[in-house]
Amino acid sequence: TDRQGNKAATIEIADQPDTSFLDGKVTAEALKRLDKLSKSKQPFFLAVGYIKPHLPFSMPKKYWDIYRNKSFIRKEAEDKQPIHAPVISFHNWEELRGYTDIPKHGNLSIEKQEELCKAYYACVSFIDSQVGKLLGKLKELGLEKNTIIVIWGDNGFHLGEQHLWGKSTNFELDCKVPLLIYSPEYKDAPKRINDIVELIDIYPTLTDFCGLKPAHTLSGQSLRFLIENKVNWKNRAFSQFPRPYKAVNSYKNQTHMGYTVRTKNWRYTLWYDNATNHITDRELYCMNGNKAEKENLSGKREYVDIENELQQMIEEYKNTHNK
């Protein structure tokens, strides 16, 4: 796919009801299916997928109005690339380029940056409203008493941070996603769990809650044990993205693959040449407080032991999943 092809504007706003937009139509159909499923005595699984807040940022005007007068101007330091980060870590914002209101090269104006941030948040509010409608229908039908609900995203998104727009990097903002789980068997007040988990843990979690046995061995682990404080958790998560950027949708164009592991205190990324399997670039970032992903520390003598430990994690992951 040519992500710099002919596109319209990045932002589309219309004073129309939610159902005039695709995600609103998805919600309407999901509500109908819940009505139908509630009349059946059979267990059901319903997946509801939304496009927003992916580009283009399209939403009913009422959600845009929430952020119309808010300021999204950040400090200049927040938009700088990490010190000593290799060029391969970045891209030219291909996901954003090609829209009629975005230059093919160079930076965005402050006005356009702020407009894009407002539109992104407006799309998040649009989807928040759609999820609210689904939860309201479950309660209306009495299904919330025996339904497990999982809300998650497939990737993060840069809005100018680290001088990036879009996704498809191994940085924290692209790899970290929201994950909310509701199960009626837990009566206590909601809680936030700060342990590191992976999206591959969702399926074994659902089968566990439903009393089902997975059909085969899984890489993920049930989060039930973590929720109930019954296990020392793995506290590591892996992600990967290819280069060049255009290879995201075409494996034959890949020349390098970047593997990253996130632990409590560190993010470590190794870039491999696909032809030779040699490591071409390394990135080590402290993830604590204000230092998070500000400087690539790889190669510094004081971090040799940490790098060796994290590299072993990546090698084990790579060897296990690339067979």
Language-model regions, residue ranges each:
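Hydrophobic residues within well-ordered, non-membrane alpha-helices that form the packing/core
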Residues: 33-34, 135, 227, 314, ...
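Alpha-helical elements of Rossmann-like donor-binding domains used by nucleotide-donor carbohydrate transfer enzymes
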Residues: 29, 62, 133, 201, ...
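Carboxylate-dense, calcium-coordinating segments in secreted/extracellular and ER-lumen proteins
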Residues: 293-297
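Active-site-proximal cap/lid insertion segments
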Residues: 1-27, 33-42, 47-146, 150-196, ...
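Compositionally biased, low-complexity linear motifs
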Residues: 300-313
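C-terminal cap/loop subdomain of S1 sulfatases and analogous C-terminal strand-loop tails that border
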Residues: 155-161, 187, 200-203, 208-287, ...
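C-terminal helix-rich "cap/oligomerization" subdomain common to oxidoreductases
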Residues: 47, 310, 314-323
